[in-house]
Amino acid sequence: MVELSSVISKFYNDYVQNTPKKLKLVDIYLGYILLTGIIQFVYCCLVGTFPFNSFLSGFISTVSCFVLAVCLRLQANPQNKSVFAGISPERGFADFIFAHVILHLVVMNFIG
C-alpha cells in the first residue's frame, strides 16, 4: 500500500511540474465532461430514459465532446509535435471548435 501511495504522489508531482497550463485546462474540461456523463448515466439508471431522444442526444453529445477534447489534448501536447508536424496548436483548436459546432447542430437536430 505504501508503494501505491508513493507512485500516486510521484505521478501527481510530475503532472504539476511538467504539464503545461494549456493541457491542464483541457484536463479540467475532460474531468467536467466525464462528470457530466456519469451524472447522466446515474440519472438514467435511477429515473429512466423518458424522453429517450433527449437522453440519447445528451449522452452521445457528452461522449463525443470527450473524444474531441482528447483529440485536442493530443494535438496541443508539445511532446507530440513530431506526430502532428503539419498541424499547429491553433489549427488543432480551430478544428476542435468546428467539430463542436457540427456536433451540436447534429445533436439539436436529433432532439427534434
Curated annotation (Swiss-Prot):
Its main location: endoplasmic reticulum. One of its GO terms (cellular component) is oligosaccharyltransferase complex. It is found in: Endoplasmic reticulum membrane. It holds the Pfam family DAD. The chain crosses the membrane at residues 28-48, 52-72, 92-112. It comes from Drosophila melanogaster (Fruit fly). Subunit of the oligosaccharyl transferase (OST) complex that catalyzes the initial transfer of a defined glycan (Glc(3)Man(9)GlcNAc(2) in eukaryotes) from the lipid carrier dolichol-pyrophosphate to an asparagine residue within an Asn-X-Ser/Thr consensus motif in nascent polypeptide chains, the first step in protein N-glycosylation. N-glycosylation occurs cotranslationally and the complex associates with the Sec61 complex at the channel-forming translocon complex that mediates protein translocation across the endoplasmic reticulum (ER). All subunits are required for a maximal enzyme activity. It is a multi-pass membrane protein. The keyword Transmembrane helix applies. It comes from the Eukaryota. GO terms for biological process: apoptotic process; protein N-linked glycosylation. Coiled coil: none annotated. Disruption phenotype: Lethal. RNAi-mediated knockdown in the wing results in a moderate decrease in wing size, decreased N-glycosylation, increased cell-death mediated by the JNK pathway and increased ER stress mediated by the unfolded protein response pathway. The keyword Membrane applies. Belongs to the DAD/OST2 family. This is Dolichyl-diphosphooligosaccharide--protein glycosyltransferase subunit DAD1. PANTHER family: DOLICHYL-DIPHOSPHOOLIGOSACCHARIDE--PROTEIN GLYCOSYLTRANSFERASE SUBUNIT DAD1 (PTHR10705:SF0). Component of the oligosaccharyltransferase (OST) complex. Pathway: Protein modification; protein glycosylation. Keywords: Apoptosis, Endoplasmic reticulum, Membrane, Transmembrane, Transmembrane helix. Residues 1-27, 73-91 are cytoplasmic. Residues 49-51 are lumenal. The gene is Dad1.
